[in-house]
Amino acid sequence: LRKNMRPEERRLWYDFLKDYPVRFLRQKVIDGYIVDFYCASAKIAIELDGSQHYTQAGVEYDEERDRLLQAWGIEVIRFPNDVLRDKFEETCRYIDQIVTSKIKSTNRK
């Protein structure tokens, strides 16, 4: 686990997820993998991707990791760091829409 959040993680956490009405956790370990943010009630993992995620090794690692998380029923949502920086409000609205939709569909079951 990292003690210090990257600037994009810090902004998403302190400016949106920390006080979001549905609980999110930071740096959640799931089956040996650490996700940036996790919402158990919506079964969503949010990942903020820096440049290392776009190398061949990074892409392969992320694909393997996403498959494992999906096997647990967790939807992985990825945002490139630059999208979070450039379109923060839109990113937050998108996260809200997904969480709301997932919780509604879970409650209907």
Language model feature labels by segment:
Residues 1-109:
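Nucleic-acid endo/exonuclease domains
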